[in-house]
UniProtKB/Swiss-Prot annotation:
Record organism: Chloroherpeton thalassium (strain ATCC 35110 / GB-78)
Keywords: ATP-binding, Cytoplasm, DNA damage, DNA repair, DNA replication, DNA-binding, Nucleotide-binding, SOS response
Lineage, broadest ranks: Bacteria, Pseudomonadati, Chlorobiota, Chlorobiia, Chlorobiales
Name of the gene: recF
Residues annotated for ATP binding in this entry: 30-37
Name of the protein described by the UniProt record: DNA replication and repair protein RecF
Keyword Protease: no
InterPro entries documented for this protein: DNA-binding_RecF (IPR001238), DNA-binding_RecF_CS (IPR018078), P-loop_NTPase (IPR027417), RecF/RecN/SMC_N (IPR003395), RecF_2 (IPR042174)
PANTHER family listed in its UniProt record: DNA REPLICATION AND REPAIR PROTEIN RECF
Length: 368
């Protein structure tokens, strides 16, 4: 996947800007506060209809603008060209168009223009709450598996309905036929989601090990494990077996859920555990090891999506060089400039002397 042209109006700090990137690595440099991250956000919006930061659409509005509009020309690795337009205003909401055709559902774009983003905030993947790691799981699988995304969205809707019913029934000591219906639906969706997540983690482990191996200066073995309350046979289990266990678990927790008015079990409460050399990353790793793990997670995510889709994602790396020493920075550039990598965008506060990198000043982009 390649971005040929990006036009920006009323987005963040950019009132009007046009960006014409190159193939391979694009390094965007400039002082802090000049809109470098905003540019990466705009690219992410055109690929996935949202920012890679936890912000709302209204937050992305330029302070002098009543709406923002992004237009991107993208080309797949098979040379199919697409034009994506994202429009947002507080009055009209968000609208997304692909080749002038409006999207009925924003989820339809997921996986069409694969994109991976890495920012300093991603340290939350290893140091933050389980929600951050579930979000990573869902983003990785959803871009490569539309059935998973459909089940995930359905699960969230059913979970909300079940939680509402549980809240209404709070402190009762008996169930109801309506709750049983929602529980059966949630159990089936939960089994599908957990089944795919576990298989993803097993496959992804090799991509993570490969990402570590790409850095010659690192001599560590990473690991990850899916954490759920279910008792699973590590060698073999079926989706049907998962569904049976989940139904039994809900039956076991029924009275606790009625007492608390909340769904207490399911993939929305699961987690990922990370390790280095078989030791817990959270408990034993240094800050530098955490940063390295996050970078390798994102590289692994990039190459995982690339292989499953047979399409190289666009890679957005915000201020990544501040997290790396000079040797690992050079190793990262070598990885990103290899034939198996595609187009990438790296922001930094100063110009870097890498032969493989096309340099852009943020001021030059803003002036269009």
């Amino acid at each position: 996947m390649k971005l040929f042209k990006l036009s920006i109006h009323g987005f963040r700090s950019h009132q009007d800007a046009v960006f014409l990137p190159h193939d391979g690595i694009n390094l965007i440099y400039g002082k802090n506060g000049t809109g470098k991250t905003n540019l990466l956000e705009a690219i992410h919006y055109t690929c996935l209809t949202k920012s890679f930061l936890s912000t709302s659409d209204s937050d992305a509005l330029h302070f002098q603008a009543g709406h923002f509009e992004l237009e991107a020309v993208l080309q797949s690795d098979s040379e199919n060209e697409s034009k994506v337009r994202v429009y947002y205003s507080p009055a009209e909401g968000k609208h997304v168009f692909i080749n002038k055709t409006p999207l009925e559902s924003f989820s339809k774009i997921v996986g069409e223009f694969p994109c991976v983003a890495l920012s300093p905030y991603d340290i939350a993947l290893t140091q933050g709450s389980p929600q951050e790691r579930r979000r990573f799981l869902d983003a990785s699988i959803s871009q490569t598996n539309k059935a998973y995304l459909a089940d995930l969205l359905s699960y969230r809707r059913v979970l909300a309905q079940r939680n509402k019913l549980l809240a209404d029934m709070k402190h009762r000591t008996f169930s109801s036929p309506e709750l049983d219906v929602w529980t059966a639906s949630l159990s089936a969706l939960a089994a599908s989601i957990i089944f795919r997540r576990i298989h993803f983690v097993r496959d992804f482990a090799q991509y993570l090990e490969n990402a570590y191996a790409d850095f010659q200066s690192i001599d560590e073995t990473p690991g990850l494990t899916y954490k759920t309350e279910l008792s699973l046979n590590e060698n073999s289990f079926s989706e049907a077996e998962l569904a049976k266990q989940i139904s039994e678990k809900f039956e076991e927790m029924k009275f606790d859920e009625l007492r608390r008015g909340l769904t207490l079990f399911g993939p929305h409460r699961d987690d990922l555990a990370f390790s280095i050399n078989n030791l817990s990353l959270r408990k034993y790793a240094s800050q530098g090891q955490h940063k390295t793990f996050v970078i390798c997670l994102k590289l692994a995510q990039y190459f995982y999506i690339c292989e499953l889709l047979s399409e190289k994602p666009i890679f957005l790396l915000d201020d990544v060089f501040s997290e790396l020493d000079s040797q690992r920075a050079e190793e990262l550039v070598r990885i990103l400039s290899s034939k198996r990598s595609g187009q990438s965008f790296i922001t930094t506060t100063e110009r870097k002397d890498f032969a493989e990198v096309k340099q852009h000043t943020i001021g030059g982009i803003i002036s269009g």
